[in-house]
From Swiss-Prot:
Gene: ydiU
Its biological purpose: Nucleotidyltransferase involved in the post-translational modification of proteins. It can catalyze the addition of adenosine monophosphate (AMP) or uridine monophosphate (UMP) to a protein, resulting in modifications known as AMPylation and UMPylation.
Family membership noted in the UniProt record: Belongs to the SELO family.
UniProt lineage: Bacteria, Pseudomonadati, Pseudomonadota, Gammaproteobacteria, Enterobacterales
UniProt KW keywords: ATP-binding, Magnesium, Manganese, Metal-binding, Nucleotide-binding, Nucleotidyltransferase, Transferase
Gene source species: Shigella boydii serotype 18 (strain CDC 3083-94 / BS512)
Protein's name according to its UniProt entry: Protein nucleotidyltransferase YdiU
Length: 478
């Protein structure tokens, strides 16, 4: 089957990019590809059998027209000016059978005009982390970019030490970022901001294109998508680590996996990025930061959208987030209805978990085994203060009984939303260390496991992290 590519970005958004081709690596070789995603995108298996090829920037497919996008942004709350694709190149937009498109974005593809002080490269470590994280999030049901392939090489790339240079093929319906809009707003080119908005509506909100109120309705949906995404992050214990405005997806996707982390111990103030000295992007601050970022996006639209309409949309953020978060947390607790004591029960559990540094994922997974008429629970052994747990657990079981639902039905629901497996940093690190020695088996094993996060397992993928795996420091160097 021949793949079809279109050039909408190149044709419709002049002055938002620089056309250029990838710079191949030395002795590049394909070490992993996403068979399931490739099948979904109707990519012929033969493309993965001819060396690095398109996956390593050594060839282009017919119809591809590679370019690097320009955007700007606020980083750690400070205006950073022009940024852009410093090491990534949009190879093309694949036209799918249903008329939608999928960006093929090659990360680590070499220098671009937007590389600033960088070398345009990515390392094997970071490409593995992004591939694992984006696929883990996808199978958890959270909107995200996807990873299609990883290429490694003999080209050394220098970060804290010399590391193998690599490339990641990332795919997404769009790479539109808040930062695209900021770039032209701060250059006082509001007409180009409007062009970006029209492009987004035309291709991703086409049902609004002929509506005279299209900009307000569109921005309201961007707010809602963002609120929903953040609610989902919070419920699975995901910390992004670097929520700069240039890393915010207009479509509400999880974008740009850098120093991310999933909670091990329940620590509301968890900081996964060791460069985040003030804790701006701590786990519990993510909802507030996302709203701040939406406010920056709203500012860029103010030349052609009424400020009252923008503020009305922004005012809806908290309610949308709390609604999604509340629904998801009730499911995690096994509540079939909404009762006034639910928030108190959840907050008391969180307080108990924070005091005891309980494992976030294991606690909710073990809670899924609760029998409403039995005081016995394997979760009890996870707590030192048994009296405090017993007191909470008795009230929790009383709440379950109000719903008049069988244990089996409730447990099935809870186990479908409380994963047994999340991508803990130590699991990623183990796969990385093996891969850097040339052994890709653990990378493939872990990818396979992450496809079934809600299935029970009896291996170390679902155990507490070992001592060496706790508090692994992760930075933006990738």
């Amino acid at each position: 089957m021949t793949l079809s590519f279109v050039t909408r970005w190149r044709d419709e958004l002049p002055e938002t990019y620089t056309a250029l081709s990838p710079t191949p690596l030395n002795n590049a070789r394909l070490v992993w590809h996403n068979t399931e995603l490739a099948n979904t995108l109707s990519i012929p298996s033969s493309l993965f059998k001819n060396g690095a090829g398109v996956w390593g920037g050594e060839a282009l497919l017919p119809g591809m027209s590679p370019l690097a996008q320009v955007y700007s942004g606020h980083q750690f709350g400070v205006w950073a000016g022009q940024l852009g694709d410093g090491r990534g190149i949009l190879l093309g937009e694949q036209l799918l059978a249903d008329g939608t498109t999928m960006d093929w974005h090659l990360k680590g593809a070499g220098l671009t005009p937007y590389s600033r002080m960088g070398d345009g490269r990515a390392v094997l470590r970071s490409t593995i982390r992004e591939s694992l994280a984006s696929e883990a999030m996808h199978y958890l049901g959270i909107p995200t970019t996807r990873a299609l392939s990883i290429v490694t090489s003999d080209s050394p790339v220098y970060r804290e030490t010399a590391e193998p240079g690599a490339m990641l093929m990332r795919v997404a319906p769009s790479h539109l970022r808040f930062g695209h809009f900021e770039h032209f707003y701060y250059r006082r080119e509001s007409e180009k901001v409007r062009q970006l908005a029209d492009f987004a509506i035309r291709h991703y909100w086409s049902h609004l294109e002929d509506d005279e109120d299209k900009y307000r309705l569109w921005f309201s949906d961007v707010v809602a998508r963002t609120a929903s995404l953040i609610a989902q992050w919070q419920t699975v214990g995901f910390a992004h680590g670097v929520m700069n405005t240039d890393n915010m997806s207009l479509l509400g996707l999880t974008l740009d996996y850098g120093p991310f982390g999933f909670l091990d111990d329940y620590e509301p103030g968890f900081i996964c990025n060791h460069s985040d000295h003030q804790g701006r992007y701590s786990f519990d601050n993510q909802p507030a930061v996302a709203l701040w970022n939406l406010q920056r996006l709203a500012q860029t639209l103010s030349p052609f959208v009424a400020v009252d309409a923008l503020n009305e949309a922004l005012d809806s953020y908290q309610q949308v987030l709390l609604t999604h978060y509340g629904q998801r947390m009730r499911q995690k607790l096994g509540f079939m209805t909404e009762q006034k004591e639910d928030n108190a029960l959840l907050n008391e559990l969180f307080s108990l978990m924070a005091r005891e540094r309980s494992d976030y994922t294991r606690t909710f997974r073990m809670l899924s085994l609760t029998e409403q008429h039995s005081a016995a629970s394997p979760l009890r052994d996870e707590f030192i203060d048994r009296a405090a747990f017993d007191d909470w657990f008795a009230r929790y079981r009383g709440r379950l009984q109000q719903d008049e639902v069988s244990d089996s039905e409730r447990q099935q629901l809870m186990q479908s939303v409380n994963p047994a497996l999340v991508l803990r940093n130590w699991l990623a690190q183990r796969a990385i260390e093996a891969a850097e020695k040339g052994d890709m088996m653990e990378l493939h094993r872990l990818h396979e496991a992450l496809r079934n996060p809600f299935s029970d397992r009896d291996d170390d993928y679902v155990s507490r992290p070992p001592d060496w795996g706790k508090r692994l420091e992760v930075s933006c160097s990738s």
